[in-house]
């Protein structure tokens, strides 16, 4: 008899965005003529930059010729891409990295979900709350979280509430933790940490031999000068932090899949008898066993993001989305809602009015004005009473959604 991994049975219901899709599909069947505007899941809508498309075409042509054909590539990524990542994303901020500290992958979702595999099951995990569901769910699957409780928490996870009451800035945990997930600019709240606030976490990790898993997938959307783009801008972070980045939101690669993870060789974790081991070598071992690398043509496309044309074109797209964020934020404030985010991130986090629950507000938005967002409670118990909208729609749909907001009744 084959036995299942019973930890999967601890996962509550379906994945958040699957549940949203189910509800929207049911509504569409009952209302086939409704024009639904989707401001929920964070998928982009603008096409890939011309420089990226040109590089894709050239790479595809290379694959058609015997002398330039590429088969299996390095699991860690081709040097032509890794060198550009270091040159453009880190060196201008005074951060020095070796090429073997950067691992190209098929997505930050994959890496943030998979990185926990190299840690023991008895590590104490801390997450901000609300939080991107992958961080928690992947630890549930591994068997690290204990039981799911009636209050929406897992018994062995330390939750760090981020609400309007603390300006969405998580406090250091009162109990000792070993693995800390941080995402800034934050998904879902759209809020950020200053360099001083981030330093507190680095200092905590250094003092407690903890590891920070830092998701900075939205760093390209930062507008304010005092907001760090990388955790490695903080002294000592290269001893305790892993950083995840993605081309998905930076350059529209949600459908082409390319990202990277930085694992400095200084970062170590320990065996039970106290022996230190580099996470870099462990992650490399994991990747070479379970991952065959990102396709050559996709990495050529990603490298084109760093050309002068690619930089200009991707910045224009990011500016487009951030203008959408400004429009949504202003539109919601104009009808009297309390709104956060949308300044350094493409996410708008609003307080639901009159004590309405997150899912109740979802249903009101869908049924009354045919606009889809994401219930805050889907990101964790501290997200109850909040709602996320994204700026990744078209300008036309964004403006139309803002007009529809005026018809909301609550």
Curated annotation (Swiss-Prot):
Enzyme nomenclature, EC number: 2.6.1.83
Purpose of the protein: Involved in the synthesis of meso-diaminopimelate (m-DAP or DL-DAP), required for both lysine and peptidoglycan biosynthesis. Catalyzes the direct conversion of tetrahydrodipicolinate to LL-diaminopimelate. Can also use m-DAP instead of LL-DAP as the amino-group donor.
This protein's pathway: Amino-acid biosynthesis; L-lysine biosynthesis via DAP pathway; LL-2,6-diaminopimelate from (S)-tetrahydrodipicolinate (aminotransferase route): step 1/1
Gene3D superfamilies xrefs: Aspartate Aminotransferase, domain 1, Type I PLP-dependent aspartate aminotransferase-like (Major domain)
Protein name, entry field: LL-diaminopimelate aminotransferase
UniProt entry keywords in alphabetical sequence: Aminotransferase, Pyridoxal phosphate, Transferase
CDD domains (UniProt xref): AAT_like
Subunit structure: Homodimer.
An MF annotation (GO) of this entry: L,L-diaminopimelate aminotransferase activity
Species of provenance: Acetivibrio thermocellus (strain ATCC 27405 / DSM 1237 / JCM 9322 / NBRC 103400 / NCIMB 10682 / NRRL B-4536 / VPI 7372)
Positions of post-translational N6-(pyridoxal phosphate)lysine modification: 249
Family of this protein: Belongs to the class-I pyridoxal-phosphate-dependent aminotransferase family. LL-diaminopimelate aminotransferase subfamily.
Cofactor(s) listed in the protein's UniProt record: pyridoxal 5'-phosphate
Binding site for substrate: 15, 42, 109, 132, 187, 292, 388
Gene Ontology biological-process annotations: lysine biosynthetic process via diaminopimelate, diaminopimelate-aminotransferase pathway
Catalytic activity, reaction form: (2S,6S)-2,6-diaminopimelate + 2-oxoglutarate = (S)-2,3,4,5-tetrahydrodipicolinate + L-glutamate + H2O + H(+)
Broadest EC class assigned to this enzyme: transferase
InterPro entries, alphabetized: Aminotransferase_I/II_large, DapL/ALD1, PyrdxlP-dep_Trfase, PyrdxlP-dep_Trfase_major, PyrdxlP-dep_Trfase_small
Record carries keyword Transferase: yes
Annotated positions binding pyridoxal 5'-phosphate: 72, 108-109, 132, 187, 218, 246-248, 257, 292
């Amino acid at each position: 008899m084959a036995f299942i991994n019973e930890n999967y049975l601890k996962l509550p219901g379906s994945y958040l965005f699957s549940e949203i899709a189910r509800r929207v599909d049911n509504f569409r069947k009952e209302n086939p003529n409704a024009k639904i505007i989707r401001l929920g899941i964070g998928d982009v809508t603008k096409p890939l930059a011309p420089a990226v498309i040109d590089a894709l075409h050239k790479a595809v042509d290379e694959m058609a010729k015997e002398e330039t054909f590429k088969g299996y590539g390095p699991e860690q990524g081709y040097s032509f891409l890794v060198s550009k990542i270091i040159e453009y994303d880190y060196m201008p901020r005074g951060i020095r990295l070796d090429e073997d500290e950067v691992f190209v992958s098929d997505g930050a979702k994959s890496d943030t979900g998979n990185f926990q595999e190299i840690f023991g099951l008895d590590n104490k995990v801390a997450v901000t709350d609300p939080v991107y569901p992958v961080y928690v769910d992947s630890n549930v699957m591994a068997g690290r979280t204990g039981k799911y409780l009636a209050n929406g928490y897992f018994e062995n996870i330390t939750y760090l509430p981020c609400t309007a009451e603390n300006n969405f800035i998580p406090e250091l945990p009162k109990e000792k933790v070993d693995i800390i997930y941080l995402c800034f600019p934050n998904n879902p709240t759209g809020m950020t940490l200053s360099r001083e606030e981030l330093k507190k976490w680095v200092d905590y990790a250094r003092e407690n031999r903890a590891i920070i898993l830092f998701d900075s997938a939205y760093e390209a959307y930062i507008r304010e000068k005092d907001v760090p783009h990388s955790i490695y801008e903080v002294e000592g972070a290269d001893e305790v932090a892993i950083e995840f980045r993605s081309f998905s939101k930076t350059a529209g690669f949600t459908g082409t899949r390319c990202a990277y993870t930085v694992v400095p060789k200084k970062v170590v974790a320990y065996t039970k008898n106290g022996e230190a081991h580099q996470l870099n070598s462990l992650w490399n071992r994991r990747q070479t066993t379970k991952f065959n690398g990102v396709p050559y043509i996709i990495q050529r496309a990603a490298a084109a993001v760093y050309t002068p044309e690619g930089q200009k074109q991707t910045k224009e797209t990011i500016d487009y989305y951030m203008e959408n964020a400004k429009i949504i934020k202003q539109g919601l404030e104009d009808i009297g809602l309390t709104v956060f985010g949308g300044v350094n991130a493409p996410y708008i986090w609003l307080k639901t009015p009159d004590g309405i629950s997150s899912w109740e507000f979802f249903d009101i938005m869908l049924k009354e004005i045919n606009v889809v967002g994401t219930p805050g409670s889907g990101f964790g118990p501290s997200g109850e009473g909040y709602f996320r909208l994204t700026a990744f729609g078209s300008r036309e749909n964004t403006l139309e959604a803002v007009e529809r907001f005026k018809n909301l009744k609550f």
